[in-house]
């Protein structure tokens, strides 16, 4: 037991001491969008260093793909998800030909620059066993609601990923990332696995409200929450 506690202490010390030598902050781009939901508006900026995802998202907005969709999955304390073109509010018929929007996007994963802090905007994807290149869905996206961590639990998350994920090669979290995860929260279990292409700049209260909606065993909301539309307000 003493040996185990000593090993854990060493891991925690190493975790606390680590930091990226190049501690870059997220580069917020020029494009600003507003996601109008039945619970209020969420304003986000799209990153310029993930241009494929940014341009695709703009195109999907302009095509009306997200109009009147439901938030179809909620993971409490982690994410809210939408983007399935066939899942309209009230069971309405799709307004677009969903078969035209089954495309994928090459990964633009920019960890550690972009990480899963609260408010991160990212595209969903199929799991590694069928998608080793981590290509993204062309329409399905999620927003991180997340939770706050203390430094000890963050260290445990990172060590757990090293132990459980074959080929785990992510660098240790930087001092900046630790500060964000302990003060604002996020979902570090997802870091390095998905393309983050933007972040919420206003409306996190709406994100948190949606994340608290009761769900069934498959993480589907028991009460319908709607994306009325997404509009571009600045480019």
For each predicted feature, which ranges?
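Bacterial N-terminal signal peptides that target proteins for export
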Residues: 1-8
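Cyclophilin-like peptidyl-prolyl cis-trans isomerases
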Residues: 7, 18-235
